[in-house]
């Protein structure tokens, strides 16, 4: 069989990429993003949630929690999807998560219903997140693990990456939502800095920079930002469109990113391909130059 090792200095891929304002950095770039991507019009908070549940995050009439993948069927003929999914305020109902908490600056004006930072979440998990900053939590210190409708006090034996974690004062989303969180918060702080809690943002910034690289934009995130833009002056989240923006705005020293790799992530020597070990045939599609591949044949 074949065992592959990848060694990469600056290689990461997202679904697609558009370089915005090339050559610009720092404050001037942030001003350009504000001037060109700040929406003047958003839906009401009620209408925004209806769009999220019936269109943006509706998968074959089911809405899934971004933190636990808990899904609820939504009757397409029901007149009030907010009420339908809440299940009377049940812990297993689904409500709306403000990635940048309302108490930290998203409670007024367009910020409250800007869909670029709103996500469906299981009620109990949303409550556990509260207004806590996002953080990497030591697994040995995690208080509660969340997956589907489960809430575990001990570390799960399988599917660990599918779980979100909470600890008093901190919250860690599941692995495949970390990049989405980072890009939503970079967007929010760029567009609504004047009303945002800067200390709250700064406490998360290094972690968000890492998560942006760890979990690049996939096809769903790319599709959804354009779906949202239809209701917000045609303006997508620029941090989804251009993977270099965090580095140029908030994450000085962050490694470079590349585009054109769907479903495969390259993160230094930690990356694994599947299947690995492999036999017979495996295909790898690359769009990068600064990497090396070492192949060992073991008999």
Protein language model features and the residues they cover:
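Bacterial Sec-dependent N-terminal signal peptides
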Residues: 1-15, 261
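C-terminal outer-membrane/trafficking sorting elements
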Residues: 263-299
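Short alpha-helical segments and helix-capping/turn motifs at coil-helix boundaries
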Residues: 45-52, 79-80, 103-107, 168-172, ...
